[in-house]
Design a protein with these regions (language model features):
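Metallo-beta-lactamase
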Residues: 1-42, 48-118
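Active-site-proximal loop/helix segment associated with metal-binding centers of metalloenzymes
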Residues: 2-16, 66-80, 132
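A short catalytic or substrate-binding loop motif that flags glycine-/basic-rich loops and adjacent residues
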Residues: 24, 44-47, 175-178
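Solvent-exposed, amphipathic alpha-helical segments
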Residues: 59, 127-138
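Soluble or luminal CAZymes and related metallo-dependent hydrolases
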Residues: 83-90, 127, 176-179
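Histidine/acidic-residue-rich catalytic or RNA/ligand-binding cores of hydrolases
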Residues: 117-126
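C-terminal regulatory/interaction regions
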Residues: 134-191
Length: 191
């Protein structure tokens, strides 16, 4: 990522005072109020810096980008596998650790809160395996060509779920597929 790319996609990054930064450790308890504690869980695999947050009281895990993208149409999980940190084994280990929790729902950045966390975690693992296999079979294509092929494959998958063309277009518009290709290829290069 370049500074220009980050600014275009997420705005200007401004410095903050060092004393405002608190180190987070795996398993740390964050007291929300006198009756509620959220547990910080180090959750690498998608990115080395990633944490998920578990609210034992409600059985909710806040996973950010760890699980991928989940749209309202069924349980089709679109992985989020960016460079340089995507690592399948580490991500699966993270997901297996999270599966051991008593979960009632999962909240993800893209998109929403879902009441079938174990099913979605399973679907995420299956989707990641499918994406790796698909992308691994495109070694001679440029990043752009592979990205275009991935989009064609995804559109076919969405259509098989009877999702309308406008919605598919919106879903595809949310993906940076060249970045996904780069993340998977970077991972496969070191296997």
């Amino acid at each position: 990522y370049t500074e220009e790319w980050l600014k275009k996609n997420w705005g200007e990054i401004k410095p903050i005072p060092l004393e405002n930064i608190k180190k987070l450790n795996d398993g740390a308890d964050i007291k929300i109020d006198k009756n509620r504690i959220i547990k910080a869980l180090y959750s690498p695999g998608h990115a080395k810096h990633h944490y998920s947050f578990y609210d034992e009281t409600s059985g909710t895990i806040f996973m950010g980008d760890t699980l991928g993208l989940i749209y309202p149409h069924g349980n089709f999980v679109q992985p989020n596998l960016p460079p340089p940190d995507f690592d399948k084994e580490v991500l699966f280990s993270t997901l297996e650790h999270i599966e051991k929790l008593e979960l009632k729902q999962v909240a993800i950045a893209h998109f929403g809160i879902h009441s079938n966390p174990y099913e979605l975690i399973n679907n995420a693992k299956e989707s990641i395996d499918l994406w790796l296999q698909f992308i691994d079979n495109l070694p001679d294509l440029t990043q752009k060509e592979a990205s275009d092929r991935l989009v064609e494959w995804l559109v076919a998958n969405y259509k098989s779920l009877n999702i309308d063309d406008k919605t598919i277009s919106n879903y595809i518009g949310n993906g940076n597929f060249e970045m996904q290709i780069n993340g998977v290829r970077n991972y496969l290069k070191y296997q």
